[in-house]
Each structure stands twice: as structure tokens, then as C-alpha cells.
Amino acid sequence: MELKNSETKINLMRAFAGESQARNRYTFAAGQAKQQKLHVIEAVFTFTANQEKEHAEIFYNHLKELSGETIQIDGGYPVDAAQDMAKLLRMAQHNEFEEFDPVYPAFGATAKEEGFAKVANSFDMISKIEQTHGERFGNLADLLEQGKLFLSDVECGWMCLNCGYVFTGKGAPEKCPVCDHDKGYFIRLSMAPYTGA
């Protein structure tokens, strides 16, 4: 089957549109987190937005042979506008889990049936990434809802995302003693990027 006559063409454009919109929603949410001085959540939304941009580009690149054409799609896309940060995180979690299952597996199955193995592989692998995104947003929402984003029941490491200072205690310090940034920049060391072996 040719891509121009396929359902996969439409699914790729739907996925491109969805990833592009997710990127913008997360960029908007990052700005809101920054206003609320939740810089750790700002960083996670920005980090995830950049990954969504990459997903959009992957799906778009699968459509290159159709350059110059207009692909009509019909789809529903979420409006996630809330002032409550935990609610924004929960909405993001929900949307990511929908892409994980059922949306991208169904798109992948269609691509496979139509003979587009590389496209099917992209949908399958990206669906697993979306699961990770959903889990990440859910973990942060849990901590925020429990009042434990900057507190712990046990001593643990806390890293300042601005300068890298690591503090050990049951909670993040109010201010970083090195760079003077507020506690909104601290993340549990176990959740900090690039710290694993």
C-alpha cells in the first residue's frame, strides 16, 4: 500500500498534531510552574515538552514523501487549563497514558497491517515513552498532593537544580546555601537528572 492511500498517513498527522499540542501545553504549564516558584516542576514540564517536540518531528518525518499535500484530520485534543499545579500534572498524566494505551498501540497495529513496519515501530516505542511521561507526572502530582514535594519522612538527598548543591535532610532547605535560590529549585536526589550510575 502507498502511504498516500493509507490510514497510517492520517494517524501520523494526528500524532504529529497531538505531540505538537502537548509540547505547547507543557510549555504553558512550565510557565505557570515558574510563576508559582515550583521550578522543579517547571523543569520537568520543559524537559517533557522537548521530548514531545522530538516525537512530533519523528512522526512528521514519516510523512516527508507527501510533501506539498494537505492531510485532513479530525480529532479531539484536550484543553488543560488549570491554576492548580497538581490538577495540571494529573491532566498531563491522563493524556500521556491515553497515548500509551490505547492510541499509539492502535496506530502501530494499523501501520503494521498496512505494511509500514518502521512507522509501526515508532508508534510502539514512543507509546512506551509516553507511559514514562505519565508515570513521571503522576509521581510529581502524588508528592504535591501529599505536601511532600519538598519534604520526606526519612532523610534523603536534595539537589539544587540551579547549582548542583546536594543537601541531606528530611526536607529541602528554604534557600540554597550556595546560590541562594529558593527551595522550589530542589528535587530529591533520587529523582535528579544525570545522577545515576
Regions inferred by a protein language model and the residue ranges of each:
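Non-heme di-metal
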Residues: M1-A197
